[in-house]
UniProtKB/Swiss-Prot annotation:
UniProt record similarity statement: Belongs to the GroES chaperonin family.
A GO molecular-function annotation: protein-folding chaperone binding
Lineage: Bacteria, Bacillati, Bacillota, Clostridia, Peptostreptococcales
Keyword ATP-binding: no
Protein name: Co-chaperonin GroES
SMART domains xref list: Cpn10
Main location: cytoplasm
Length: 94
């Protein structure tokens, strides 16, 4: 199954959070900080959003930093993804 985002939305897959601290302490699932780094897996077409033309600046494969608590998390075929607006992406990691 493929996800096709609409308008100015992108689909990202979060990079796994560290399971150990720098000092070697193993963190339980709830104690791990949610990652804010992800890989873009699909990009919407852009278009007119709220009266403004939106040009998509992201491409599939980009590694990005996104705002905490943004987007909608979905699980498809056992994989977890987040769908969010391009404006919720803060930076591209090069």
């Amino acid at each position: 199954m493929k996800i096709r985002p609409l308008a100015d939305r992108v689909v990202i897959k979060k990079v796994e959070a560290e399971e150990k601290t720098a000092s070697g302490i193993v963190l339980p699932g709830a104690a791990k900080e949610q990652p804010q780094i992800a890989e873009v897996v699909e990009v919407g077409p852009g278009g007119i959003v709220e009266g403004k033309e939106i040009k998509m600046e992201l491409t599939v494969g980009d590694k990005v930093i996104f705002q905490k608590y943004s987007g909608t998390e979905v699980k498809i075929e056992g994989q977890e993804y987040t769908i969010l607006r391009q404006s919720d992406v803060l930076a591209v990691i090069e």
